[in-house]
């Protein structure tokens, strides 16, 4: 019998097993029959290239010298970073075009929009209508470039971000693209943003849904109930153990954003 729910979303191409956010990671994740979708992180360089890279700088993931590794990615050109490889691998920091080309069209893609380096960007929700318009305007140049690449493929695309401005800009640029607010512990804000942007999903952290014993919290139950009533999915991040996967499946989540397919037991 085939597996139905929860779906398994390969976090950065299964970061625990592969050099994260690289072309090789995409190929490995896509070749695993447990994978339903792949999550990747999009960033801007100083010369307006869209790369796939998680961190603000290169210090954690590359052996770049301090003059480069301590500089924010958005202040570096693609030529300045393209020669460095991820971790102990030979995999370079890829362009979004390269990563998407490595993922089969049949595989879903969760594109997380990271901070593009513009000043005045508010993390999380924005207070009022005027501020939301301004936030969307600040995000728009980067979002347009990322979506120009992503929507040129046939992938089932879901755009997520911790920044409301990114969601607003996505809605303005491509109204038909599915979006999902990423939230930390403020799940109520996640519900508000999901309603505001008619989101297809909400992406909360595990500890916003489960207590230390693995039992669904009252806030988690409420979030799941509201989301499912509105026909929205809940995709939880970041799953690192089979115990977490089982508890989240019992809670009724729709997707597991996982660092390895090995953490997803067959009985979920």
Model regions: which residues?
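Conserved, mostly hydrophobic/aromatic
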Residues: 11, 29, 41, 81, ...
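Haloarchaeal acidic low-complexity proteome signature biased toward cell-envelope/secretome components but also
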Residues: 1-9, 31, 65-68, 77, ...
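Metal-dependent phosphodiesterase/phospholipase catalytic core, i.e.
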Residues: 54-173
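Structural preference for beta-strand elements that scaffold enzyme active sites
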Residues: 7-9, 36-39, 108-112, 156-160, ...
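C-terminal active-site rim and adjoining tail of enzyme catalytic domains
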Residues: 180-268
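Structural motif
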Residues: 32-35, 102, 197, 251
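Active-site beta-loop-alpha junctions enriched in small/polar residues
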Residues: 13, 43-45, 56, 114-116, ...
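Short beta-strand/loop segments at the ligand-binding rim of alpha/beta enzyme cores
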Residues: 4-9, 152-156, 170-181, 220-237
């Amino acid at each position: 019998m085939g597996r139905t729910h929860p779906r398994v979303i390969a976090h950065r191409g299964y970061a625990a097993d592969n050099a994260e956010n690289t072309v090789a990671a995409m190929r490995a994740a896509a070749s695993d029959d447990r994978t339903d979708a792949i999550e990747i992180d999009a960033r801007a360089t100083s010369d307006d290239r869209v790369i796939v890279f998680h961190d603000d700088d290169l210090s954690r993931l590359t052996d770049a010298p301090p003059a480069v590794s301590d500089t924010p990615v958005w202040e570096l050109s693609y030529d300045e970073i393209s020669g460095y490889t991820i971790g102990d691998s030979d995999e370079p920091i890829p362009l979004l075009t390269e990563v998407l080309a490595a993922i089969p069209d049949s595989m879903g893609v969760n594109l997380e929009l990271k901070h593009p380096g513009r000043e005045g960007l508010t993390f999380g929700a924005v207070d009022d209508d005027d501020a939301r318009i301004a936030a969307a305007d600040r995000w728009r140049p980067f979002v347009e470039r990322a979506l120009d690449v992503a929507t040129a493929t046939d992938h089932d695309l879901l755009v997520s971000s911790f920044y409301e401005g990114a969601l607003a800009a996505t809605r303005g640029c491509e109204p038909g693209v599915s979006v999902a607010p990423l939230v930390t512990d403020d799940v109520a804000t996640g519900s508000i943003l999901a309603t505001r942007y008619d989101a297809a999903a909400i992406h909360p952290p595990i500890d916003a849904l489960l207590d230390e014993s693995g039992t669904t919290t009252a806030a988690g139950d409420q979030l799941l109930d509201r989301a499912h009533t509105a026909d929205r999915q809940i995709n939880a991040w970041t799953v690192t153990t089979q115990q977490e996967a089982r508890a989240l499946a019992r809670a009724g989540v729709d997707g597991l954003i996982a660092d390895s397919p090995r953490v997803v037991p067959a009985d979920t």
